[in-house]
């Protein structure tokens, strides 16, 4: 795939994977991106997942013909990008691997060698001259592993962004970028907003025309749009006004309460309402929704003196990813001693800048006139 006159795509698509990282549903597969810069010296940028090593090597040979790579640049050591380092180094015994000091420590763990006689260790501001192309390296620790670096080619104004600006989905499937990029960012990188913000500040000083991520499409235009969304996501800002109702329901009574709240919110002019049944929806999508919109209602039952397991999992996902700067409403259901609201408050107590609704809904087994009135009041407060 042509990117610029000297930069080509040599990655692969994976339609065999059902759960990315063992947890994220990827109905449209994944891409594992790799690139090659062809100059006086040749640099291959990252490898691919372990199952695609031979396809990837064939892609390299197709682009290079009789020439051989001089460098393998490793931005990130997660196995979906690093699994074929040793395969590459054996295929090209004259090549040198270029990466961060922490990455070489990880190579020792993964492959039993840190390529001490065939390596270049780079850090912040270091450069690698290829000819007319020169790569400048920028450290990006904890976006989202500690060894991560990104690199910038000033000749073609290309940022090789590691997992930054990645998305779910293979490249032979057309779909909206933001939806699956948001789910990818919130799920995988979302905990590290502060570190992502630091990287964005570094990127602001670069003249970026093209972004080459390790997953998803190459971004060749409208860079301000992508950088703006990353600023929203990593800054834990509200992307869109609306209310997310996340509920669990054992016998349908809490579900009915959630549906009534949805109806009342729309009647009161709420611009957008999203409802997620946490037992049946894609949990990662529900988490994505909670970070996308400004308001969240948690509706669940008291269960074994706690909250229903899917709600506990959902809240844990939120707090693990530093959920903050939102308005939260609570709805609890119980037949005796309902305590779910109190438990959810306790689970969220470490979250920053959460505004709790004054109106909390208490359902005693099934909807009543009293709980319907509480739902009406909550809807007016949220809308």
Segments predicted by a language model, with ranges:
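FMN-binding flavodoxin-like domain, especially the glycine-rich phosphate-binding loop
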Residues: 171-211, 215-218, 260-276, 286-383
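Terminal amphipathic helices with adjacent charged low-complexity linkers/tails
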Residues: 215-240
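Structural motif
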Residues: 41-43, 71, 133, 157-160, ...
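Metallo-beta-lactamase
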Residues: 2-5, 99-148, 192-198
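Active-site neighborhood of phospho(di)ester-bond hydrolases with catalytic His/Asp-centered motifs
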Residues: 45-47, 69-77, 97-100, 159-163, ...
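Active-site metal-binding motif and surrounding structural segment of the metallo-beta-lactamase
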Residues: 40, 51-98
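Conserved beta-strand hairpin/beta-sheet module of binuclear metal-dependent hydrolase folds
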Residues: 2-60, 150-153, 157-161, 254
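Active-site-proximal loop/helix segment associated with metal-binding centers of metalloenzymes
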Residues: 144, 148, 156, 164-191, ...
